[in-house]
Amino acid sequence: KLTPALIAAYNFFAGKRKAGIVSFITFLACTAIGFVVLWGPSLTYFGMLLSGDSGLNSGIVFKTNQSVLGVWTRLMGEASRGGLVLSVLVAVLGLVAAVLMHRAGEVAYALCLAGLTSLLASPISWSHHYVWIVPFGIVLLRNQRLPEYLRIAGLFYSIWTAFAPFKLLPGDNNVELTYAPLHMLVDNFGVYLGVAILIGSIVAAYTPWGRDRRRAQLHLRNGEAITAET
């Protein structure tokens, strides 16, 4: 799962340098230990992953795999490097969105974006992995400062993911590859909406709302610095 890596990167670029560096070093150390203990399987796993499929799970196409790679596989008929590249792009997109929102003072919202990004970008993200929608929904309900379109889209996304209507679709035995356009839309809609929320968050950060929020945070930090000096 990409959650630790995405959260580490988010911490680093959001200004929490020490937390980000410690997390990244821990990741490298654990990965190195894995190679030392299981050199062959580790080499096979990462080598196959670079081609778009780790080979450890045959269910990438399954309807409840709500990841970018899952969507790519259902649309294209197979997991491939293109899906992996798209997943990396979404990871970068989500990281940018989270950092921008953090700098706008929306820390809880930013952390939820980072968590959801890790699920969208992971090769396998079963629908029950989406526990991030719980704090995400709470933040959206309580936070009146966020742009209304982000709150509405985010709450709808949380409800859609929680009820998971795509589970009503036929599944197993790669039947997902034969879905009609409407079935395909229902199955992939949550991922589309999740990516749209990431894009919408970046757009919001560059609107007057975002600029005002960053300016307010800068004044707040400067005020705290002056208070600390006195």
Describe the role of every protein-language-model region:
Residues K1-G15:
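Voltage-sensor/pore transmembrane module of 6-TM cation channels
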Residues L2, C30-T31, G52-G55, G137-N143:
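Alpha-helical transmembrane segments and their membrane-interface exit regions
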Residues T3, F24, L89, W132-F136, ...:
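Membrane-embedded alpha-helical segments of multi-pass membrane proteins
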Residues L6, A32-P41, G59, P123-S127, ...:
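Juxtamembrane membrane-interface segments at transmembrane alpha-helix termini
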Residues F13-Y130, T178-D187, G210-T230:
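Primarily membrane-embedded glycan-assembly and transfer machineries that use lipid-linked glycans
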Residues F24, G47-M48, I133-V134, L146-L155:
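Short alpha-helical "patches" and their helix-cap loops
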Residues S127-L141:
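Hydrophobic/aromatic-rich transmembrane helices and adjacent perimembrane loops
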Residues L141-T230:
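Aromatic-enriched
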